[in-house]
Amino acid sequence: MQNRNFTVSLVVDQSPEIVFRAITNVRKWWSGYYSEEITGGTENLNDEFTFRAGDGVHYSKQKLVEIIPNKKMVWLVTESRLNFLKKKDEWTGTKIIFEISKKGNKTQILFTHEGLVPEIECFDDCSNAWSLYLQKSLLNLINAGQGQQAKKVNEIAGSKLPGSSKNE
C-alpha cells in the first residue's frame, strides 16, 4: 500500500545528535517567513507548543507524544485553525513525524505529516510550506547553525498566506 501522507527525505553530513538538536529547536527553523510565533516547550515528552503565522491565518497546537533521542520525534496536532481553509481544523488529529537514521557517513531525516494527504484542501499549500521550512530553514540550521530567513513571503508557490499572489 502506497504512503499518501506528505513526506520529505533529507540527507545531511551532520550527526544524528546535531540533527535531533536542530529539530527540537523549533523556533530556529519553523520561522522567518510569515511573522511566526511559537510558544511553549518543544523538546521534552508531553511538551505542548503553539504555532501562529500570517497574522492569524495559521494557528496550531502540538503535543510531543513520542521522543527517541537522536532517532525520532512525533508531534500530535491537538488544535488547529487554518483560516484560509473551508475546514479550518483540518490539521487537528494529524501527526508530524521526524525519523532520523544513519546512512553510511550521512544522516537521513524522514519527515512525514501523517494525515496531510492529497484529498484535503490544505495539501498543496501546506506541503509547499513544509518543503520551504524543511529544505531551506531546517537544513540551514543543521548545516550552518542558523535557520533561513526569507526575504520574500511569496517564495512559496501557490500559497494563500498574506503576501502571496493567490491572496491578492
Residue ranges of predicted features:
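A conserved amphipathic terminal alpha-helix motif
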Residues: 115-168
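Solvent-exposed residues in well-ordered beta-strands and their adjoining turns
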Residues: 11-15, 52, 78, 101-103, ...
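Hydrophobic-ligand binding "helix-grip"
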Residues: 31, 40, 57-104, 114
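Hydrophobic pocket/interface hotspot
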Residues: 19-23, 49, 64, 75, ...
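Intrinsic-disorder/low-complexity, polar/charged segments enriched in Ser/Thr/Lys/Arg/Asp/Glu/Gln
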Residues: 3-9, 48, 59, 72, ...
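Short beta-edge strand/loop motif at the mouth of beta-sheet-based domains
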Residues: 7-8, 18, 25-61
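Aromatic-glycine hotspot motif
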Residues: 2-16, 65, 90, 101-107, ...
